[in-house]
Regions:
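Short, small-residue-biased leader/transition segments that mark boundaries at the very start
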Residues: 1-3, 7-14
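Short beta-strand elements at the ligand-binding edges of bilobed clamshell
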Residues: 15-24, 138-144
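Accessory alpha-helical/coil subdomains and C-terminal extensions
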Residues: 20-124, 128
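Catalytic, metal-anchored helix/loop core of enzyme active sites in primary metabolism
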Residues: 116-120, 136-148, 155-159
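Phosphate-binding loop/pocket of nucleotide- and phosphate-handling active sites
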Residues: 165-202
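Short gly/pro/ser/thr-enriched loop/turn and capping motifs at secondary-structure boundaries
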Residues: 10-11, 79-81, 132-136
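A short pocket-lining beta-strand/turn micro-motif at the edge of beta-sheets
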Residues: 124-126, 162-165
Length: 202
């Protein structure tokens, strides 16, 4: 299901990975992390990047995979900074000199995480909180098209005196749900993708 609410973190959703604004937010984060990586590369440092999502780690996870982050920390799963530090040191032995750690805002404490990793590894680490810049910018093609489709469907519902509905997408088709039902929907965390993200990194 894809629920057509403007939630950049894609917190409310079942099965699929999409709410309006999510694709735009992810692309914004990827662009900014790519720029931070350039700085990390020139200064041989670790960048701890905190991204939005409230208590959902979907933005952190997907952008972490897209950016080849060294490690991704999300509120859905426990984490161990000793393991993060160990991975940094192991990859440093292979010649890698820069590291990206993506932190979901549901975890927070990015400054403390950066200081802890620097103390454990001896690698200079800096925290960057992207904040509300993730909510701005021009929407991506996907956000524009899906928002138009769902908006059109919503107007049709209103024209037929049907209210208190949330428009979504099921198996590629536009559908609608009772608003209370939609509010109770939560998107399951993709643990397999999380495993992939922390196994392969650039």
């Amino acid at each position: 299901y894809e629920i057509s609410l403007g939630l950049v973190g894609s917190e409310m959703c079942i099965r699929d990975r999409y709410t309006i604004g999510y694709d735009t937010a992810m692309n914004t984060v990827v662009e900014m992390v790519d720029k931070l990586r350039d700085t990390c590369h020139s200064h041989d440092r670790c960048s701890v990047v905190e991204v939005m999502g409230r208590n959902a780690g979907h933005i952190a996870l997907n952008t972490g995979v897209a950016c080849g982050a060294t490690f991704v920390l999300v509120p859905e799963l426990p984490y161990d900074l000793d393991e993060v530090a160990k991975k940094m040191l192991e990859t440093k032995k292979t010649g890698k000199q820069n590291f990206i750690v993506i932190v979901a805002e549901g975890i927070g404490h990015s400054e403390l995480i950066a200081k802890t990793l620097e103390a454990k590894t001896g690698i200079e680490a800096r925290a960057t909180i992207l904040g509300h810049v993730q909510r701005g910018g021009s929407p991506t093609l996907r956000d524009r098209v899906v928002a138009s489709e769902m908006g059109y469907y919503a107007v049709e519902l209103l024209e037929n005196d049907i209210g208190n509905r949330v428009v979504g997408m099921q198996q590629g088709k536009i559908v609608d749900f009772d608003i209370q039902e939609a509010l109770s929907m939560k998107k399951p965390f993709d643990e397999k993708l999380y495993q992939i993200s922390n196994t392969i990194s650039i």
